[in-house]
Each structure stands twice: as structure tokens, then as C-alpha cells.
């Protein structure tokens, strides 16, 4: 058997999230069931860079699992994609894992997320399920200014889910940019790792600034409070995409 690294994309709608659960279909189940077709029916255990929630999408998720030695990268990609039909999950790249110790989760040095807000009166037709529809005009520059107070290493208790299982609320936020692209407000976040719901809670809080309901400085005050009730609501999963995962030793060849 050989350990393979996989770069995946998926439409998070219709899934209970990445992780297997009893109450519905997960992305993990789709991938591992497809892989079992290549392993004589044995279901391999996968490891993933980020356990996305229900409704959250991915354009650059990274997973690893063991498959038979006889397969090459092209065969791994094509076979898994064939067996994952008709589900909205696809292997974009497959490559041998850099080493036996390499882990999609623990070897990652950075994760990048993008959140899209459709900021117009009319509801989305083509992008429904992929954006958060906000009718009230948003002040993107004010949102960006407020976001900068969250950069650096902080206790992000105010921005993590009450169900978060991380041992520590300390995280280092490397990037949180907000910009307008026509009718879309784009929020881009980067860090080595994030707490559960951290990105969605930051977006929900910044929306209050964009609507003028919060002044810019209140975001820093919410952070300092170390209290979930001091920050804004959790943004819906629809607009969130795991864009990329970075590694010191990247398993995927770059052209």
C-alpha cells in the first residue's frame, strides 16, 4: 500500500460536512467508499486538512489515505472520481505523500478561506448556496479597517463556537482582508489553523460594521472581551470556501 495525498473540491450542499456522521452523508464517506472499490472492499481511513461544516465548500481541501501500490497518480485521480459519481466531490490532483510522517492536518503551515457576500436587493439565482445574500448596503472599507484589529496572535474565545473542542483559544491570524468586487463583498482569511466557526463568526461580526450597526472599534472590544456573546452572529455556511492549504513540502507538483 502507498500513502497518497489528494487535493479535492466539493460542493458542500447536501453534505453534513466533511466528517462521517450518523445523520447524513459526509464528504469523508463519499471519498472512503470510493477508495474501498480500489482496496478490495476494505474501507481506508482518511486524514484531512480541515473538517469543514455542513454547507461549507472546498476548492483546495487536502486529504490522505492509503491505496494499492499498483496505481499511479492519474489512475488514483480518475478511479476515485469515477467511483464518487454522482456526488459533487472531485479529486483535482493526486500525488504520493512526501513522507510516512506527512499529515494533511498536522504538516499544514497555512489555510486560506474565502467568504462571499452578495450585496444587492435581488436574491441570487445562479449563486444560491454559494453566497450570503445581504440586502442592506455594506461599507467594505469600514469592514476591512475593523478586520485589521483581529490580525496577530490573540485569544479568539469571542469568535469560536461554544462546541469548539480545541485545547486553546489562541490563534495567529495572518490575513483578514475585505474588499468589494461589484455586487460581491469578498472576505479572505489566512492562518495556520482556525477555531471552529472562527471565520464565520468573524464575518458575521464584520457585517454589523458594514451595515453601520457597529462602529469600527467595537470589533477590537469584542475580541478583548473573550466572550462569545460579545461578538456578532455566525454567518451562514453558504458563502464559505476552503481555498487552499499550504505546506513546507508541497506534495503536489506545480507547473
UniProtKB/Swiss-Prot annotation:
Enzyme class: isomerase
Keyword terms of this UniProt record: Isomerase, tRNA processing
Catalytic residue positions: 53 (nucleophile)
Highest rank taxon of the organism: Bacteria
InterPro entries: PsdUridine_synth_cat_dom_sf, PsdUridine_synth_TruA, PsdUridine_synth_TruA_a/b_dom, PsdUridine_synth_TruA_C, TruA/RsuA/RluB/E/F_N
One Gene Ontology MF term: RNA binding
Residues the record lists as binding substrate: 113
BP GO annotations: tRNA pseudouridine synthesis
Chain coiled-coil ranges: none
Pfam families, A to Z: PseudoU_synth_1 (PF01416)
Catalytic reaction(s) noted: uridine(38/39/40) in tRNA = pseudouridine(38/39/40) in tRNA
EC number(s) on file: 5.4.99.12
Family in the record: Belongs to the tRNA pseudouridine synthase TruA family.
HAMAP family xrefs: TruA (MF_00171)
Biological role stated in the UniProt entry: Formation of pseudouridine at positions 38, 39 and 40 in the anticodon stem and loop of transfer RNAs.
Subunit structure: Homodimer.
Family annotation (PANTHER family): PSEUDOURIDYLATE SYNTHASE (PTHR11142), TRNA PSEUDOURIDINE SYNTHASE-LIKE 1 (PTHR11142:SF0)
Protein name: tRNA pseudouridine synthase A
Amino acid at each position: 500500500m502507498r500513502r497518497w495525498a489528494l487535493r479535492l473540491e466539493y460542493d458542500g450542499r447536501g453534505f453534513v460536512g466533511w466528517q462521517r456522521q450518523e445523520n447524513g452523508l459526509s464528504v469523508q464517506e463519499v471519498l472512503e467508499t470510493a477508495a474501498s472499490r480500489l482496496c478490495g472492499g476494505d474501507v481506508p481511513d482518511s486524514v484531512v486538512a480541515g473538517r469543514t461544516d455542513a454547507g461549507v465548500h472546498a476548492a483546495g481541501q487536502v486529504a490522505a489515505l492509503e491505496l494499492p501500490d499498483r496505481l499511479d497518480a492519474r489512475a488514483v485521480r480518475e478511479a476515485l472520481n469515477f467511483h464518487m459519481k454522482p456526488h459533487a466531490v472531485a479529486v483535482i490532483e493526486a500525488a504520493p505523500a512526501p513522507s510516512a510522517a506527512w499529515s494533511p492536518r498536522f504538516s499544514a503551515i497555512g489555510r486560506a478561506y474565502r467568504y462571499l457576500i452578495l450585496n444587492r436587493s435581488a436574491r441570487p439565482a445562479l449563486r444560491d448556496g454559494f453566497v450570503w445574500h445581504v440586502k442592506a448596503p455594506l461599507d467594505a472599507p469600514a469592514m476591512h479597517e475593523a478586520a485589521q484589529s483581529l490580525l496577530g496572535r490573540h485569544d479568539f474565545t469571542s469568535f469560536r463556537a461554544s462546541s469548539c473542542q480545541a485545547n486553546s483559544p489562541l490563534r495567529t491570524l495572518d490575513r483578514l482582508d475585505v474588499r468589494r468586487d461589484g455586487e460581491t463583498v469578498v472576505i479572505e482569511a489566512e492562518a495556520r489553523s482556525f477555531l471552529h466557526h472562527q471565520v464565520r463568526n468573524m464575518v458575521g461580526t464584520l457585517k454589523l460594521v458594514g451595515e453601520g450597526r457597529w462602529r469600527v472599534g467595537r470589533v477590537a472590544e469584542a475580541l478583548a472581551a473573550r466572550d462569545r456573546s460579545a461578538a456578532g452572529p455566525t454567518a451562514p455556511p453558504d458563502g464559505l470556501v476552503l481555498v487552499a492549504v499550504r505546506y513546507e513540502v508541497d506534495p503536489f507538483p506545480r507547473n
